[in-house]
Amino acid sequence: YPNEPVLYNISGACFAGLGQLDNALKSYEKALAIKPDYAEAHNNLGITFQELGQLDEAVKCYEKAIAIKPDYAEAHNNLGILLQELDQLDAAVKSYEKAIAIKPDYADSHYNLAVTFQGLGQLDEAVKCYEKAIAIKPDHVEAFNNLGSTLKELGQLDTAVKSYEQILAINPNFAEAHNNLGITFQELGQLDEAV
């Protein structure tokens, strides 16, 4: 059956979605036993290894997926997430930039790149990337929230307030935004609004 590797890959994703990571691993490995150059299965196997905390194995899987399919934006993004987790921030930046070069409208890569720049203290770059993620995905509340905190770090409190207010217009129950908005109002000396 020529579609058998695809079916194993799909069943692996289903098992992963159910939290049955050992079964997911087995399914991806079956797919790869039949079709060793199946980039998507290598990527999914990497995600599963990462969830299991087997980070070295995850790196190998993402790198294998990229070697097979160099224009695989999702694998570059996933490798970036893993490198970020390993505190290899400069390498993570390169992975996200590759993902964005391949897929310029990849909101998650712009967001992840922004988080990494924020971690590196490159706040102006982080702001640009958060804004790009939001331009692509206007309901990206995490990007708005982190944009607000970055603007706050830059001393742009009024603009940070606008960012938090935009989150609450999208999702009025986003508790972290309420908290951040209150703290920012307090820092602005607007105690009535802070309450």
Regions found by a protein language model. Name each.
Residues 6-17, 40-51, 74-85, 108-119, ...:
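Conserved alpha-helical positions within TPR/SEL1-like repeat arrays
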Residues 34, 68, 183-195:
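Low-complexity/repetitive intrinsically disordered segments
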Residues 19-25, 34:
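Leucine-rich, hydrophobic repeat-scaffold detector
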